[in-house]
């Protein structure tokens, strides 16, 4: 019951917001600078080393600019794309247990009983060549 009240309160608060603020160029020049690429690579750990990757990024930015231009005044935000029906959660029944060791054997790398995945589209070999991240 309380979760529904909190959800409705958050939804009402979200209606009052007109949009998000961003440091991005509001006109959407569409050009991606070297400085921006370095910043995005640092944030996302995705390598934009090829012209094809940069072109794909510029295309995604242009698409986002087109979406930003859509007039959504007076449009109620949706809770779900399936608002016309009830979505019930299934019961969570554990069928097997104590199989963590078996599952972790499927991973390329494991650290302290956790899967370690390569970030973004940077392969393990490229990561091994780079300096480790400094934790500040």
UniProtKB/Swiss-Prot annotation:
It is an enzyme of class 6 (ligase). GO terms for biological process: glutaminyl-tRNAGln biosynthesis via transamidation; mitochondrial translation; regulation of translational fidelity. Its main location: mitochondrion. Keywords: ATP-binding, Ligase, Mitochondrion, Nucleotide-binding, Protein biosynthesis, Transit peptide. InterPro entries: Asp/Glu-ADT_sf_sub_c, GatC. It catalyses: L-glutamyl-tRNA(Gln) + L-glutamine + ATP + H2O = L-glutaminyl-tRNA(Gln) + L-glutamate + ADP + phosphate + H(+). GO terms for cellular component: glutamyl-tRNA(Gln) amidotransferase complex; mitochondrion. It is found in: Mitochondrion. Its EC number is 6.3.5.-. Residues 1-27 form a transit peptide. Subunit of the heterotrimeric GatCAB amidotransferase (AdT) complex, composed of A (QRSL1), B (GATB) and C (GATC) subunits. Allows the formation of correctly charged Gln-tRNA(Gln) through the transamidation of misacylated Glu-tRNA(Gln) in the mitochondria. The reaction takes place in the presence of glutamine and ATP through an activated gamma-phospho-Glu-tRNA(Gln). NCBIfam families: gatC. This is Glutamyl-tRNA(Gln) amidotransferase subunit C, mitochondrial. It comes from Bos taurus. The lineage of its organism: Eukaryota, Metazoa, Chordata, Craniata, Vertebrata. The gene is GATC.
């Amino acid at each position: 019951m309380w979760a529904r009240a909190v959800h409705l309160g958050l939804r009402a608060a979200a209606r009052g917001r007109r949009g998000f603020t961003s440091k991005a160029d509001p006109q959407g020049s569409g050009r991606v600078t070297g400085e921006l690429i370095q910043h995005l690579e640092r944030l996302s750990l995705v390598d934009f080393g090829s012209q094809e990757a940069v072109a794909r990024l510029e295309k995604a930015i242009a698409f986002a600019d087109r979406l930003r231009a859509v007039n959504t005044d007076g449009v109620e935000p949706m809770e779900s794309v399936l608002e016309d029906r009830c979505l019930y959660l299934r019961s969570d029944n554990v069928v097997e247990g104590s199989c963590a060791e078996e599952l972790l054997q499927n991973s390329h790398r494991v650290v302290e009983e956790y899967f370690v995945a390569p970030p973004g589209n940077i392969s393990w070999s490229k990561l091994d060549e780079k300096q480790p991240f400094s934790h500040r």
